[in-house]
Amino acid sequence: MGLWRGKSPLILASQSSARKMLLANAGLEFIAITADIDERGIQAASKLSSPRDIGLLLAREKAKAVSANHPGSHVIGADQTLALGERLFNKPAGRAQAMAQLRDLAGNYHELNSAVAVAHDGKIVFEDVSVARMTMRQMSEAELSAYLDAAGDAVTTSVGAYQLEGLGIHLFERIEGDHFTILGLPLLPLLAFLRSEQLIAV
């Protein structure tokens, strides 16, 4: 018997391999369903400027969008934003944009904001944002090119053009924050909420 005690299946509103891995490693059975939302459109319409607030808004919208079609289920939405000062980064569209992002991040400190929201019957019942502070080492053009050659198309799937669970770890000299936040899901506060609602057995 698994840990999930909800009457309806737990749903992750994401196909992120890292988020799916984190939930699976925590012993939770779940269904992964992509949230069909216009992230850029929602962000623009909101007129929010804080990376933290934008991440939380998108996590909420993902959870609510999937929840609307799955009554009774608890739906987890998550989003991650990267901020270099006041500048917000999006996933790079290709290699050239990935290189430009890495040039800006190299030798500098930035923040990863990981937001999570849980929806039930279309309403948000839990939300949280965790922050990781990241310092990327100074790198030459040759080093950045070598990284992009090795990482391939995977760089376009993450903000900042790096995946810390893979080759991206080579880019950093200092990381402050928990592993789950860096991978895009504040797992400890999420589990605490599920436990408080008696939705998990442990």
From Swiss-Prot:
The reaction(s) catalysed by this protein are: a ribonucleoside 5'-triphosphate + H2O = a ribonucleoside 5'-phosphate + diphosphate + H(+); a 2'-deoxyribonucleoside 5'-triphosphate + H2O = a 2'-deoxyribonucleoside 5'-phosphate + diphosphate + H(+)
* Cellular component aspect of the GO annotation: cytoplasm
Source organism, top-level taxon = Bacteria
Q: What are its cofactors?
A: a divalent metal cation
Record protein name field: Nucleoside triphosphate pyrophosphatase
The keyword Iron is assigned to this record: no
- Which NCBIfam families is this protein grouped with? maf
Keyword tags: Cytoplasm, Hydrolase, Nucleotide metabolism
User: EC number(s) per UniProt?
Assistant: 3.6.1.9
- Stated family: Belongs to the Maf family.
User: Where does the record place it?
Assistant: Cytoplasm
Entry-linked Pfam families: Maf (PF02545)
